[in-house]
Amino acid sequence: MSTNEQLAWDFDDGDVAEVRPDTGIARFAPGSEQWIAALQPTDDDAIRLDRFDVNTMTAEAAARLWARVAAWVESDQIAYYIDDSPVSSDAAYDARMRCLERLEAAFPSLDNPQSPTHRVGGSFSNDFVSVRHPSRMMSLDDVFSIEELKDWYDSVIRDLDWPESKPLPMSCEVKIDGLALNLIYRNGVLEQGLTRGDGVTGEDITLNVRTIGSIPANLGGPKEDVPDFVEIRGEVFMRWDDFHTLNNEQEDAGRAPFANPRNAAAGSLRQKDPRITATRRLSFYAHGLGQLTWGADHPRGTHDVVADQSQAYDLYTRWGVPVSPHNRAVTSFQEILDMIEYYGEHRGDIEHALDGIVVKVDDLGLQRTLGATSRAPRWAIAYKYPPEEVNTELLNITVQVGRTGRVTPVAVLKPVYVAGSTVARTTLHNGFEVKRKGVLIGDTVVVRKAGDVIPELVGPVLERRKGREDQLREFVMPEFCPSCGAKLAPAKEGDKDIRCPNVESCPAQLTERVISLASRKAFDIEHLGEQSAIALTNPEENRPDSVATYAPNITEVLVAPGEEPDPYEPVEGLELPAAQKPVLSNESGLFDLTAADLRDVRVWREAAIVEVHETVGANGKKKKVRKRVGGSGLWHQVPAFWTAPTPAKKLTAKQLAERAQREAAIESAETQGGAASETTGAPTGAEAPLGTMPGFAAASYPEYDVPADAVIVRVDHKTTRTGVTDVPVIIRPGENTRKMFDEMDKARHADLWRVLVALSIRRLGPPTARLIASAMGSLAAIEKATIEDLTAIDGVGPEIAESVVNWFAATREPGDWRGATLRAWQAAGVGVDEAETSSLPQTLAGKTVVVTGSLEGYSRDSAKEAIIERGGKAAGSVSKKTDYVVIGANAGSKAIKAEELGIPMLGEIQFAQLLETGSID
């Protein structure tokens, strides 16, 4: 293409766009590597793509062009469908899409289900496919004391044979409490975003990564600074101010707040719908490099031009990739201690949560000399701050009842901020533990977070008791269940735990069982969470004790900053509504539920106190800022599963015409003896509604949008300039309710092991349920199994076998709730499918593997499941029969025993290799 050539296209509106000839790309032959690298996401280059004949390309060049254009199209789709702020013209977007389609037609290997050409409209979702990292993404070893840190520092000096008198450059940075992320850029274009996973493979969360504003879609800076390929490692996190804003929004919407910023970031980053992630205000800081390739034709050449961490940070800055401002270059151990001391005192003063200081050898050449273990580099270490301890008041000790009837004392604390989140409650495990700690209700107590995660009540501050003895009282475990009133007792002699024996109908136990059966470890009914479970089993939870705190029309109390709410005076004659009966009295009716059954279920919500003040926005205009500051103690009821009454939307003339057209198509199809095609679509309201109030028929209001599942509850008379108009007011199942029923339908065909877990059989978890389901093959066979049959299965112990046999024996007792549940579920199609055989290669057949310690890429259960799925036995103890022991962080006595017995010990990387190949050779 000559530099004088002009290209143009006609847009739909007749305008013409011309390519400016001074872009530099015209110097290169179309389709060449230089031409592909010079392409930019501009309208000009989109025209070039539209005119380019892809059939002249080699397969390798086509793959490079496809990757570049696909990334731009995906960014365009996210900007349009998710962010609602298009960045490209429709014509440019269409041209790029046509280019992809031509490439995929000419080179079929490029056509894959993840291609943007297969995405319809705004149907974005993440499948979280596992992808191999181009280079291993390691974790860091932790140390918890200055002595351990000094040992590491001395070992680095010793291994490098570094002269004592010569300063060793190191870099120190705060350890962000977030999620590790690997960003892959090819020719400066963001290609993929991967979670750490097990360090060898991670989950592809590219769609969600593209919604994070601080992560550039294209690397900036001069072309000579942009490599052919680079992996940028960093941390996704949520700033404190964004975290508090999100939690206010959660509470305003009646949803549970997140415990801490890390949980919020993790939950946001792993959303299947990236539109949700886009609203969560996530941030990113880069802190490391993976693979870096400049390419033979690159101005920098093929040599490694990044010599140390400081140069890497300089590159990030030029590329537009953010780095943490909280880092220092140091040359002595004392300077490292200074950094640790400073941020230990200022943990709450920076923009994000932190849980330690990372120390790295600065020089990349020295890093390579030091090398790495199977899971972590030897040239870096993470110093973890000791658990933060604070004092607060023990207001009360209550008890909670779990799904198996276990009654646990819970400390109710004066809310206190500790290690990244507010703590108001923490478990005390059992009555013996309360006595051992020696705490009294009313004590000032010490609270910390074990591992900076789990709140723990350490004990009382005895000095604070002086002069207050008459205000303190001892906790006594209750004699009767606080939920159902049944007499409490240990399950057997010698048990420390006491239990509620009313397994069938204790509301607290039933609620916990429903939460459990809907969890990911069982039926995986995502939209049947804690609040929905409470609404189904105990809708009167939080019912006010008297009318004095019943405020049916108050959903929030507005106050000025620093003001207290006015006293509440109930309306004269106000009475509490009649108590509701729960929809579920046990699990048997779960799969028989319909949306109509849930129409009148209402739950209690506390009105929030909202502080409102005026401020001036960036545009100079006044705006009101709202902040939730607490609960008011006033309660009202809200629909749990259906929407509140809402006026139906009036259809436009165009919408009415489209509906008439669809109805005509359906009528025509029915007349011809067929059914309307799926593409024609049934009109809104085509199905019979669940029911309407007497006298209110949807057909009477054809000009309004009344969905098929909606109910008209009343008709409002609206006065307009043309007279009085009747507006139907409707209710319908909420979006989450509709999703819940869809997920329940899928759960009818859940794997057999999931059904076993959902039955809440004591001691039976997913790994053992998988073993039993795989060996027995059907629910009918498991029902008939003896203890001997089950213990004959490798990995099933006598206690679990006894629990399973006893549970199914109870189902045969007349009137037993477990039998009713089992028969009702089977009638609904649950558990009637045969157990599925694992489709994974049986790489571990005949091998016994023990997992100990914490793994980055696996929970304890998921690691065991990975072993079992591949034919292996996931044992709980180390013996001479053990083939391998997988060692994670904080491994205990099992690692010592494995070493004594000479059993191969694997890191997480080797574990991944073992799963894949069955060998570590």
Swiss-Prot record:
UniProt-annotated binding residues for NAD(+): 90-94, 139-140, 173, 196, 235, 360, 384
Catalysed conversion reaction: NAD(+) + (deoxyribonucleotide)n-3'-hydroxyl + 5'-phospho-(deoxyribonucleotide)m = (deoxyribonucleotide)n+m + AMP + beta-nicotinamide D-nucleotide
Entry keyword set: DNA damage, DNA repair, DNA replication, Ligase, Magnesium, Manganese, Metal-binding, NAD, Zinc
GO CC annotation, single: cytosol
Source domain of life: Bacteria
Domain BRCT: from-to ranges: 839-921
Region entry Disordered, spans: 663-688
Gene Ontology MF terms in the entry: DNA ligase (NAD+) activity; metal ion binding
EC numbers on record: 6.5.1.2
Biological-process GO terms, alphabetical: DNA repair; DNA replication
Gene3D superfamilies: 5' to 3' exonuclease, C-terminal subdomain, 6.20.10.30, BRCT domain, DNA ligase/mRNA capping enzyme, Helix hairpin bin, Nucleic acid-binding proteins
InterPro entries for this protein: BRCT_dom, BRCT_dom_sf, DisA/LigA_HHH, DNA_ligase, DNA_ligase_AS, DNA_ligase_CS, DNAligase_adenylation, DNAligase_N
Function summary: DNA ligase that catalyzes the formation of phosphodiester linkages between 5'-phosphoryl and 3'-hydroxyl groups in double-stranded DNA using NAD as a coenzyme and as the energy source for the reaction. It is essential for DNA replication and repair of damaged DNA.
Protein name: DNA ligase
Organism (species): Bifidobacterium longum subsp. infantis (strain ATCC 15697 / DSM 20088 / JCM 1222 / NCTC 11817 / S12)
